[in-house]
From Swiss-Prot:
Substrate binds at D55, R79, G101, R158. Monomer. It holds the Pfam family SKI. The gene is aroK. This is Shikimate kinase. One of its GO terms (molecular function) is ATP binding. Catalyzes the specific phosphorylation of the 3-hydroxyl group of shikimic acid using ATP as a cosubstrate. GO terms for biological process: amino acid biosynthetic process; aromatic amino acid family biosynthetic process; chorismate biosynthetic process. Its cofactor is Mg(2+). It comes from Brucella canis (strain ATCC 23365 / NCTC 10854 / RM-666). Mg(2+) binds at S37. Binds 1 Mg(2+) ion per subunit. ATP binds at G33, A34, G35, K36, S37, T38, R139.
Amino acid sequence: MSGTNKQTNLHRQTETIRQLLGSKVVVLVGLMGAGKSTIGRKVANMLNLPFKDADTEIETVSRMTVAELFEAYGEVEFRDLERRVILRLLDDGPMVLATGGGAYMNAETRAAIAEAGISIWINADLDVLMERVSRRQNRPLLRNSDPRGVMQRLMDERYPVYALAELHLMTRDEKKEVIAAELIEVLAAHLEKEQAASAG
């Protein structure tokens, strides 16, 4: 497909999403390093929608970093705060929302997302994830002697739950603009299918 045709298609798809999304929140789920925030910002910009990062919102309300919250209160308390913040954000749609890696594991959070949003699993293989997270030091779950082993365990635990998301998108070592355009395409097709089903 030529560049012009791709741009025309992308424009049509963004218009479709804006028309059909209503007040729903586009919720990106997946492991740390999958690119939820990077892709989410790009998609929000393309759709002219607000972008929110759940971890950033948590840090704002708590006045602590995610790493500090983990250390001070433990993962259980952090997940409870995370759930409450996400439930509040789901009331503010339409927007694009990137969630923390563990957020979708909470059944109550998943149910709320299913009701008020469209969940999209941003997937990536282990090598891509490790290459990305190695650039950052603020990953409390990876602060040990075997971060690759921890990441593999997280994949084993979480991927079956992430697979419950309505839509799936595989990322790879590709420009964020390309992945964002693929997400737009998948989301537009999903909304059109939903509209056709409700009309039928």
